[in-house]
Design a protein with these regions (language model features):
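Hydrophobic core/packing positions within alpha-helical solenoid repeats
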Residues: 48-49, 95, 102-103, 148, ...
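C-terminal transmembrane module of eukaryotic multi-pass membrane proteins
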Residues: 219-259
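Alpha-helical membrane segments in multi-pass integral membrane proteins
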Residues: 186-191, 210-220
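Preference for well-ordered, secondary-structure-rich cores of eukaryotic proteins
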Residues: 171-180, 215, 219-220
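Elongated alpha-helical scaffolds that mediate protein-protein interactions in large eukaryotic proteins
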Residues: 4-74, 78-97, 103-127, 131-142, ...
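Acidic, serine/threonine- and proline-rich low-complexity regulatory regions
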Residues: 180, 198-204, 220-229
Length: 259
């Protein structure tokens, strides 16, 4: 009798889990469809943000006709605020939600390649190079960096090649040097570390002394900043990656800080 009750309880739990998954999928489909309507778009984006870790959300977003175009239009609408200091927290949060959804697409193995090939990542670059350091701008900056960090974490050489081709590395170095919030410097240095640990990334950095000197200069500046204690591991890993290259190793003998 007790075994029957246990089996029944287990089956009920399993059925409830299946229903919850099904309901979540239905919710995602509903709000994905509502993104296409300007009147329901903002709320739909905010609702979908809560489900960004669902393993299928990338599929629904990417293959739903007109959805990515609508999200991209919202991104483009914010560009006008990049030349002024009038970006509200409300608008910044909306863009953060969209970029986070892009990250879900970028992380999914079934959509990552198409995401890179679409060049959508490039539309996030202006947020990285924006000069303003108010909280609303930094929210978007760190979220955009998060997409790149998530991509380089996959150990996909094509991601590194894409970053090299689109010449974003100097911008990331600048963020490392001048990041207003510690977390921004940490994310930026993590990206550089992963680039250096890639064969093509290391080759790109070391084939021109100007690039190598640019990185070592930024690393030196960061080491002198006492607020960068939490970033020491990433900095050391970048140095360790660089010395794998013979020429870089010789140059670092003269440029490494004494202590």
């Amino acid at each position: 009798m007790s075994n029957n009750k246990s089996n029944s309880s287990f089956q009920n739990t399993e059925n409830n889990d299946s229903k919850n998954i099904l309901n979540e999928e239905e919710i995602i489909i509903k709000y994905t469809d509502e993104i296409k309507n300007e009147e329901t778009r903002s709320e739909a984006i905010e609702k979908l943000y809560k489900y960004r870790e669902n393993e299928n959300i990338a599929i629904y977003l990417w293959y739903s006709r007109g959805t990515i175009a609508a999200l991209l239009q919202e991104i483009l609408n914010i560009y006008q605020y990049l030349s002024s200091s009038k970006l509200s927290n409300e608008k910044a949060n909306k863009v953060k939600f969209i970029i986070s959804l892009f990250q879900s697409i970028a992380l999914n193995p079934k959509t990552r390649k198409e995401f890179l090939e679409s060049q959508l990542l490039v539309f996030l670059y202006p947020f990285l190079s924006c000069p303003y350091k108010m909280k609303s701008y930094e929210i978007i900056r760190v979220t955009a960096l998060g997409v790149i960090a998530a991509l380089v974490k996959t150990d996909d050489s094509e991601v590194i090649n894409f970053l090299i081709r689109t010449e974003i590395i100097p911008v990331i170095l600048k963020i490392m040097k001048k990041g207003t919030f510690e977390i921004i410097g940490q994310v930026a240095s993590f990206i550089i570390q992963r680039i250096v640990n890639d064969i093509n990334g290391l080759k790109y950095i070391c084939e021109m002394r100007e690039r190598l000197f640019a990185i070592t200069y930024v690393l030196d500046v960061m080491l002198q900043n006492k607020n960068n204690n939490k970033n020491i591991k990433n900095i050391l890993r970048i140095y360790l990656g660089l010395i794998e290259n013979k020429e870089a190793k010789n140059i670092l003998k003269w440029t490494l800080p004494e202590s």
